[in-house]
Each structure stands twice: as C-alpha cells, then as structure tokens.
C-alpha cells in the first residue's frame, strides 16, 4: 500500500494510504495556481506588510545579507526572493538571450546560464565596466561558461552597445536585467538603451528599486556608494514608464516581492 502526502490533504497534513483514494483526488493544479495568483495580487496591495518587510530587510542588511548567498559556488549578491522571481520569469518565457549589466562576482550570470542550460538553449551576455581578473577566471572556468559571454566596457557606450547587439541572433527572444550603477541618470540611460532590445513577452528587470522606498536617514551606509530617494533606480524606472507604452509592471511577480531588493522592478514587454 502506497504512502504519500497528497495536495488534497495538505491543510490537515493527513497521510493517504489508500491507493484507490489517491486516484480519486481531483487535479487541483489550476486551482492552486489561481489561488497563488490571487494571493500575490493581494499581498502586493498590503502596505503594512511591505513596511514590516522593509524594516526586516534594513535590519538584516547590517550583516550584508545579500552578500551571504551563492549559486553553484559563485557569490550571487542577491536576495533569495529575487532569485526565485527571476527563475520564474526565465522558465515561463524561455529567452534566447539574457543581457545583464553589472557582472560583479559572477553569480547572477552563472545562475541565469544554469537555467538556460536546463531549458536547452540560449546564452547570457554579461556587461560590466570592470570585470576583475579573478572574477573573470571564476566565470570562464565554471561549467556554465559555455552559455556566458562577457563584455567589458561602459554599459551605455556606443561601442559596448554595438558589441551587445552583435551577440543577439536574428529573431531572438531577449530579456534584460539592469544591475550596475544605481544612480538615476545611469539607470535611465540604460533603460533607454537596453529597453528597446527587449522583445514582446520578455522581461526588463530593474534591480535595487527598494532604495526608492528608503528614507535618507535609514539608507544603508555599508556600501561603496550610497543612493537616496530621487537618485536611484525606482525614480529612473518611473520616468522611463512615462516615456514608453511597451512595458507594464507585472502585478503578480511584483506582488510577491516584499522581501526583495527589486519590488516593482519586473517589467513585462507588451508591445513589439
């Protein structure tokens, strides 16, 4: 007789041991997904929960919380919720090319490349002003290196942009992640230059929008640079959204992102 914990009894935690009963349990996958969507939308409207989450994130940032995580042995410098959200987006949309500005230690490009490896196609193009030799060595010696291309140079420099475009085959589905310099003007320039590369149905992700929710008196001081409200990614994103009708803020993904450094930063491309 089989022993399993079935979805139909998950609220009580009861075990089902009757195989015939197992076969009669309804397929509730659609209902489960619909309920998750409903709760995500509701969570995204709960400002009190968001405030509590912000307080918690600022508290753990004293320990440089985002720096404590790695992916396949490489520091990723992201919060777990953002890693999960990016995974959901990539698996759902299956981009052929993912462009990320801001390589840092390489964990993020390795992470996205590993998902493309599971999908069975595609590559990640990592762009950074300064790719340190030891970080390059880590990335280029990694098992996922075959799906990674590194471009060193200012992300919005015409020569860099030309090299990035050269990595995009015709008719590719293109996703973009912006995670380099977080000043308003730089992010806005990246949005204007990289936004047009994103194809319909794919995502444009603007990292570290959380800074736009933090008062200057509470802004983390343990960084090489400090950004404040008005000079950060969220302000740039809002300006960009007023300039284009190609993108919308995904309410489901962003609704879940309360313990996140990028709330409101996941934009879905809705027009060619």
Question: Which residues are covered by each model-predicted region?
Answer:
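N-terminal amphipathic/basic-hydrophobic helices that include classical n-h-c signal peptides
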Residues: 1-19
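Short, compositionally biased "basic patch" segments
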Residues: 47-63, 131-137
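Acidic/polar residues at beta-strand termini and the immediately following turn/coil
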Residues: 9, 24-26, 154
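Residues that form generic nucleotide/phosphate-binding pockets
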Residues: 35, 39-42, 56-60, 89, ...
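S-adenosylmethionine/decaboxylated-SAM
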Residues: 69-272
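N-terminal auxiliary segments of SAM/dcSAM-dependent transferases
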Residues: 17-50
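Non-catalytic interaction surface on structured domains
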Residues: 50-54, 65, 71-72, 103
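Membrane-proximal envelope and lipid/glycan-remodeling enzymes
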Residues: 41-42, 63-65, 175
């Amino acid at each position: 007789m089989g022993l399993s914990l079935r979805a139909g009894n998950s609220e009580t935690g009861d075990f089902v041991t009757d195989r015939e009963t197992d076969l009669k349990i309804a397929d509730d996958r659609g209902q489960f997904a619909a309920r998750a969507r409903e709760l995500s939308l509701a969570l995204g409207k709960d400002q009190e929960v968001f405030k509590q989450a912000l307080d918690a994130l600022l508290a753990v940032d004293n320990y440089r919380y985002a720096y404590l995580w790695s992916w396949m042995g490489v520091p990723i410098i992201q919060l777990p919720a953002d890693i999960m959200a990016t995974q959901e987006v990539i698996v759902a949309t299956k981009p052929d090319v993912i462009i990320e500005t801001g390589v840092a230690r390489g964990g993020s490009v390795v992470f996205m490349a590993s998902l493309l490896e599971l999908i069975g196609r595609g590559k990640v193009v990592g762009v950074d002003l300064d790719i340190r030799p030891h970080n390059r060595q880590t990335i280029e010696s990694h098992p996922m290196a075959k799906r990674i291309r590194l471009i060193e140079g200012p992300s919005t420099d015409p020569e860099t942009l030309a090299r990035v475009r050269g990595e995009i085959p015709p008719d590719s589905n293109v996703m973009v992640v912006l995670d380099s310099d977080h000043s308003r003007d730089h992010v806005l320039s990246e949005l204007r230059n990289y936004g047009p590369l994103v194809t319909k149905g794919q995502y444009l992700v603007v990292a570290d929008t959380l800074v736009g929710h933090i008062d200057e008196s509470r802004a983390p001081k343990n960084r090489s640079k400090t950004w404040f409200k008005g000079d950060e990614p969220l302000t740039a994103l809002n300006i960009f959204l007023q300039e284009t009708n190609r993108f919308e803020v995904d309410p489901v993904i962003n609704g879940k992102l309360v313990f996140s450094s990028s709330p409101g930063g996941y934009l879905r491309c809705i027009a060619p």
